[in-house]
Each structure stands twice: as structure tokens, then as C-alpha cells.
């Protein structure tokens, strides 16, 4: 049964990584919509209104990321993964909470850490997914062979 949960864990990890790609797409769409506005009041106002669509998708998708991270953490128990891996999943959940708080601080310099924390979330999720991949063949680690003593010159 744990084998099925390991596969589910791998699938959820890939879904999380796909969600992160969407997050980056949505936020970039919002930023570049604003950045490409002409330097007049009407154009800037229109750009902000158009960027709202991307920002709203970024916020909604952020909630989906949170749900998947909670599922990822719960599945790590069901898959009977090592304690270290479960601990790293707990860290991932903690980083998500920090991510949510950073997005709502109201202090621009502090909220800027939101982007850096996102990179840490992406890296940790990629590590956990790759390290615990349940599909395909795993290559056994190289075994140490006892070397023969080198012949001595005569």
C-alpha cells in the first residue's frame, strides 16, 4: 500500500512544480503588463486594470499551491517516507505559511522576500520529488569493489 502512496507522492510533487510554473507565468504577466504601459495616466490606469487579471490568477493559484503542499505533507506519512523527508515536507509547509505572510505584510522591502522564498519552495519541492521518485527504474548505487593489490615490480 505504501508503494501506491509513493506514486501519489510523486504525482503531487509534479503537480506542485507545474503550479509553481503557473505562478511564475501569472506574476510575470501582471508585471510586464504594467511595465509595458506608455507614460501617461490613461495607459498606466489601463495597464493596472489589465494586470488585475494576472494578479488575481496568481493569488487564486497560490491557494491551490497551499492545498497541494498540505496534501504533499499528508501523503509523505501515508507513503511511509523517512523521517527526514517528512521533516522536509513540514519545512515546505512552514515556508508556504511564510510565503503567505510575506505577500500581505504591507512593507514593500519585506514583501520582496516573497520572490526569494518562492525560489526556495521550488527548489525544495524539486528536491523532494526527485529524491522520492516512485516511477521508473532506480539505478543502484555503485558498490565498492575490493581492489586487488597492485603487482610489485620484480
Question: What annotation goes with each model-predicted range?
Answer:
Residues 1-154:
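Polytopic transmembrane helical bundles with strong interfacial aromatic enrichment
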